[in-house]
Amino acid sequence: MENRIQTDRIGAAFDKILQEFPERRRELHERVGRAVQRELQQQIASSGINDSSGKVRRWQVVHIGSGGGYAAVRPEKGTTGADSPGAITNYLEGGHRIASPRGGKNYRPRLRVSYVSGYHFYVNTSMRAESIAIGEAEAWADEIARELEASL
């Protein structure tokens, strides 16, 4: 009889967790997204970009899927075009071409390069993203395990 009561309690605890799972999964992805966003902001700060105002770092926002099944860090939505946050982030990430001079016959360009190298802060962040996600998932699983133990 004692075993049956304990089994019923375990079953009820599991049922409660399964009912809360979609919300908990969204919570996990929000945690992972915030952690990856912090890592990306550190990569931007250490990349050498002159971002003393923090504008480029502020542009990077966490997006959670509508069903809560994924998290992405990307430039904020807004205006489109060559001077939008997404375009500027892309130029900084991957580099960009410098337009050739179109001046008069005596014009001498200050720069003598045809391409500006990128800072690759998204690439550097993606190398650490998996370990960040694993760490957050382990902490999330530990919280669920503690809740299960407490309910028994």
Which residues make up each language-model segment?
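Short, Lys/Arg-rich flexible segments
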Residues: M1-R74, R102-L152
